[in-house]
UniProtKB/Swiss-Prot annotation:
Enzyme nomenclature, EC number: 4.2.1.41
Entry annotated with the keyword Lyase: yes
Stored HAMAP family: KDGDH
Swiss-Prot/TrEMBL keywords: Lyase
Family from the record: Belongs to the DapA family.
A Pfam family per the record: DHDPS
Pathway: Carbohydrate acid metabolism; D-glucarate degradation; 2,5-dioxopentanoate from D-glucarate: step 2/2
Signal sequence coordinates: none
Keyword match RNA-binding: no
Reactions the enzyme catalyzes: 5-dehydro-4-deoxy-D-glucarate + H(+) = 2,5-dioxopentanoate + CO2 + H2O
InterPro entries: Aldolase_TIM, DapA-like, Dehydro-deoxyglucarate_dehyd
Gene Ontology biological process terms, A to Z: D-glucarate catabolic process
Entry protein name: Probable 5-dehydro-4-deoxyglucarate dehydratase
Amino acid sequence: MDALELKNIVSDGLLSFPVTDFDQNGDFNAASYAKRLEWLAPYGASALFAAGGTGEFFSLTGDEYSDVIKTAVDACKGSVPIIAGAGGPTRQAILQAQEAERLGAHGILLMPHYLTEASQEGLVEHVKQVCNAVNFGVIFYNRSVSKLNVDSLQQLVESCPNLIGFKDSSGQIDMMTEVVQTLGDRLSYLGGLPTAEIFAAPYKALGSPVYSSAVFNFIPKTAMEFYNALRNDDFATTQRLIRDFFLPLIKIRNRKSGYAVSMVKAGAKIVGHDAGPVRPPLSDLTPQDYEDLAALIATLGPQ
């Protein structure tokens, strides 16, 4: 799949980041992970991100990273494209991107470089080196200390033909509006805030109708229902789900730092697709929080 094909795929539909399965010792469980992807693939996501943020990318060793990507590619071959997370320091990001390409992934999401702050000039060079190291499509993840301004993006799209997407987790609507108005259809634009459904309508209004859904991991039917309602301007359905499910979900998520991932793994366990524990420094939900989440999920009915 070339970069343009990937751009077309991620320009429409719902995206998701499967959690990464660990056994009770905290080791990667390839068999369980493959079953998870086989369960999720038929629900209709346009692409799945392996080893993304929700997939605990930050906690994977080099060998585990390769195992996760290979398992995802093999499990979803012929059914749904796999986009691999890749990031950290520039040379590490390059090695991961090249490994993902070698293993058959269809592109990468370029994760933040972590810790150190960087100038726009430094970020441009970072992205450029990663893009130049591979042939497939690259989606830039705009968040944390890794945020590009419009001028920097303009430079990159002119010099990196395989930079095909911009995923925003900043929540800065004015910035996103300027990016979309300036670059037009040169890039695909993805919403990437936690519990993205809450922000999906304003992002759609400014020209970014695609987003990645964390809840697709445990309520895929409802996640697709919400996306289709949003796509069809079914305001009554989106508002009902926001009021009755997503706002209460956010209240549980906000009880502890790191619950954005822990809650998703708990949800998967509740619906019968246990992915094992999260790895430190994350912590699993408390028993009370787990019970509250289970009660909330039960209101949605079978998935």
